[in-house]
Amino acid sequence: MAGPTTAERGARQQESSGPPRVRRFRPPRLRTIIILAVALVLVAGGTVWVLYGSNWTRLERVSVSGTDVLTPAQVREAADVPVGDPLVSVDTEAVEARLRRKLPRIDEVDVERSWPHGIGLKVTERTPVLIVQKGRNFVEVDDEGVRFATVSKAPKDVPTLELEPARSGSAAASLRRFDDDRLVREAVRVAGRLPDKVARDTRVVKVRSYDDISLELSGGRTVSWGSGEQGVRKARALTALMKATPDARHFDVSVATAPASSGS
């Protein structure tokens, strides 16, 4: 008697096997969950210990860059960074605030952690554009009109600012409206608009009122500038005027559209 054919055997196997089994999702066992939780706690605890408890990340050095007049030692002393403390606990904003308060010469400062043991202090100092004589000393004024330091020796090639506000007439009215700080800012504004050659030759910036600012140049020459307004146009007019009348002793650009020279 012949046995079942291959096709018949395949059909019976398919019938007996039935539909494919679906694997059920088995939730992780409690033991696995506990092991993972303990591992996370250990990792977190280890991280906290490394940052706060170990000697691996304690502050050991404070580096300073960008100084010119100031010394790195002065900056470190003013910063008062707590060497030996965990690096992560150093309050960088407080360090920046101390530097700005104790050293007004500093214009900008970046306080950065340098892992694993350092703090970097990158400073930018203010640069004087004018000086005000005060007794035997000199007060330095930056390009924003901030009087930031008093020095015993005048910095080289920085013009002197003379505040001589008039106390009567229209100039007195101007003084009531614009105080000394505002007049200083106007003088700085004028100094920043001068043509390069004129800036190099300027010895004194004299302010009598908001709209009465003049310059004393090398060789006894003078310039009536007026107010700080229309500075670019006045600078162009002064350049052209000096080129047209090189032997003149006085130049007036207080009205930019009507420049004049005299005293040749």
Swiss-Prot record:
GO biological process, one term: FtsZ-dependent cytokinesis
Main subcellular location of this protein, as a coarse class: membrane
GO cellular component, as recorded: cell division site; plasma membrane
Topology, Cytoplasmic side: 1-32
Residue intervals of the POTRA domain: 57-126
Listed InterPro entries: FtsQ, FtsQ_DivIB, POTRA, POTRA_FtsQ_type
Keyword annotations: Cell cycle, Cell division, Cell membrane, Membrane, Transmembrane, Transmembrane helix
Membrane topology reported for the UniProt record: Single-pass type II membrane protein
Positions in the Extracellular compartment: 54-264
Subcellular location: Cell membrane
UniProt superkingdom: Bacteria
TM annotation in the entry: 33-53
Sequence segments annotated as region (Disordered): 1-24
Cited function: Essential cell division protein.
Family label: Belongs to the FtsQ/DivIB family. FtsQ subfamily.
HAMAP family linked: FtsQ_subfam (MF_00911)
Protein name according to UniProt: Cell division protein FtsQ
Protein species of origin: Streptomyces coelicolor (strain ATCC BAA-471 / A3(2) / M145)
